[in-house]
Design a protein with these regions (language model features):
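Sec-dependent signal peptide recognition
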Residues: 1-9, 13
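Bacterial extracytoplasmic/cell-wall-associated proteins, especially those involved in peptidoglycan
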Residues: 17-144
Length: 144
């Protein structure tokens, strides 16, 4: 039984998008600051957008470069600490990110969504995009 459990754990891990530690840290922080107050679906959507950008030809080729690209994610230029304050919540986000990476490799790409915004703002760029989904307090978009 123990051998079966080990094999299943290894197989499950092999099905996930694998990121180097620094890239994973950028992804986890992006998920925490953008959707850390949300359930799994919101975090999974932020992970999908981030990876969709990495895979696209119009954004940088790494998670950290996508996350830290100027004015792409609000938390990276808000003047506040980039260290997650709520360690318990950050631990939960890390779990959700791990699951989201498996979902992404399994085909969940939120219809190739590349942009999102919080409902508290109304960005001009949104009117030029195709609305794909609303998940909690975020709306996600793709190209027309």
């Amino acid at each position: 039984m123990r051998l079966l459990m080990i094999w299943l754990a290894m197989a499950f891990r092999a099905m996930a998008v694998e990121l180097p530690p620094k890239e994973l840290d950028c992804m986890e922080k992006n998920a925490y600051f953008e959707a850390g107050n949300q359930h799994y679906e919101g975090i999974r959507a932020v992970v999908a957008v981030t990876l969709n950008r990495v895979e696209s030809d119009i954004y940088p080729d790494s998670v950290c470069e996508v996350v830290w690209q100027k004015y792409q994610f609000s938390w990276t230029h808000d003047g506040k600490s980039d260290i997650p304050a709520n360690k318990k919540q950050f631990a939960k986000v890390k779990e959700h990110v791990a699951h989201a990476l498996r979902d992404y490799k399994g085909g969940y790409k939120l219809q190739n969504s590349m942009w999102f915004h919080n409902h508290t703002v109304n960005p001009k760029w949104a009117k030029h995009k195709r609305k794909i989904a609303t998940i909690r307090d975020h709306t996600f978009y793709g190209d027309h």
